[in-house]
A protein has these predicted regions:
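Extended catalytic core of nucleotide-activated donor transferases of GT-like folds
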Residues: 2-57, 64-65
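Donor nucleotide-sugar binding/catalytic pocket of nucleotide-sugar-dependent glycosyltransferases
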Residues: 56-71, 75-92
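Conserved catalytic-core segment of nucleotide-activated headgroup transferases in glycan assembly
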Residues: 88, 96-163, 171-174
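Short alpha-helical donor nucleotide-sugar binding micro-motif in glycosyltransferases
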Residues: 174-177, 182-187
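Acidic donor-binding loop of glycosyltransferase active sites
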Residues: 185-199, 212
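Short glycine/serine-rich donor-binding loops of glycosyltransferases
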Residues: 201-204, 222
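Short acidic/histidine- and often glycine-rich active-site loop of Leloir-type glycosyltransferases
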Residues: 219-229, 233-234
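C-terminal "capping" alpha-helix adjacent to the active site of nucleotide-linked donor transferases
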Residues: 233, 237-243
């Protein structure tokens, strides 16, 4: 373990990641930074607030929306937004010579509005584009132990997807990044509604880096991944999303 030999006596910069037990480990650090990833509401507990008030670390958020999840009056030092980077394979996709086939792609958590998307696809999108396909790359395996806890709930949504194979829905298991890059190169659009608990959305970020236009709604952090009218569409409602 990196800290098996103990902590240094002093350090210029100490970065504590997520947990409250890490915050006070380096009291003599010249500067302490607290890097968080999930919606910041979990910080509104005494075990966090007491340490944040005493240490007042700079808090690193991964997006502007993420920063809004921590109240303005709650204790902190500086509040800084540093978005995640995107893995190089996704930005290495070259421009296509011709438009890809009428294939939409979804690569996020099936519990994040996939049921909604399937219904919208069946009722509004596919009837207007009968030869279109919706390719799904998702499942519990992506999320490790957290996914295992939600596997039964996810399976209900995935079964819904399987039942729509005659309506152009193609369900695939999660794939490695190298394969996903290839799938993005064959997709015309990424369809993803967004989720209030999402603070960055790597799924849309990866698709955008690979040059895939995205259609999203004004929910959570996805609006920070898409430039409306340039790299995709930020739809105001379900009707605009389906159009």
């Amino acid at each position: 373990a990196p800290l098996a030999a103990g902590l240094p006596e002093s350090i210029d910069l100490y970065i504590a990641n997520r947990g409250d037990k890490l915050l006070g480990l380096m009291p003599d650090a010249r500067r302490t930074v607290f890097w968080i990833h999930n919606p910041a509401r979990y910080l509104m507990k005494w075990r966090y607030l007491s340490k944040l008030w005493r240490i007042k670390p700079a808090i690193i958020f991964i997006g502007d929306y993420h920063a809004t999840t921590y109240p303005a009056l709650a204790p902190s030092g500086m509040r800084v937004v540093i978005p995640y980077g995107i893995a190089p394979p996704f930005s290495d996709v070259g421009a296509a010579d011709e438009p890809p086939p009428r294939r939409a792609i979804f690569t996020s958590n099936p519990l994040r509005s996939l049921d909604w998307l399937l219904d919208l696809w069946r009722d509004h999108i596919r009837p207007n584009v009968p030869d279109a396909e919706l390719h799904l790359f998702c499942g519990a395996a992506t999320y490790g132990s957290v996914g295992a806890e939600k596997a039964a709930e996810m399976e209900q949504v995935l079964e819904h997807a399987r039942s729509m194979r005659h309506e152009g829905v193609v369900l695939n298991a999660p794939v490695a990044k190298e394969r996903l890059v290839e799938e993005f190169a064959s997709a015309r659009v990424m369809l993803y509604r967004g989720d209030i608990n999402e603070t960055f959305c790597l799924a849309v970020g990866e698709a955008q880096a690979a040059g895939v236009p995205a259609v999203v709604q004004r929910i959570g952090s996805v609006v920070e991944r898409v430039i409306d009218g340039q790299t995709g569409t930020i739809a105001g409602d379900d009707q605009a999303f389906a159009a």
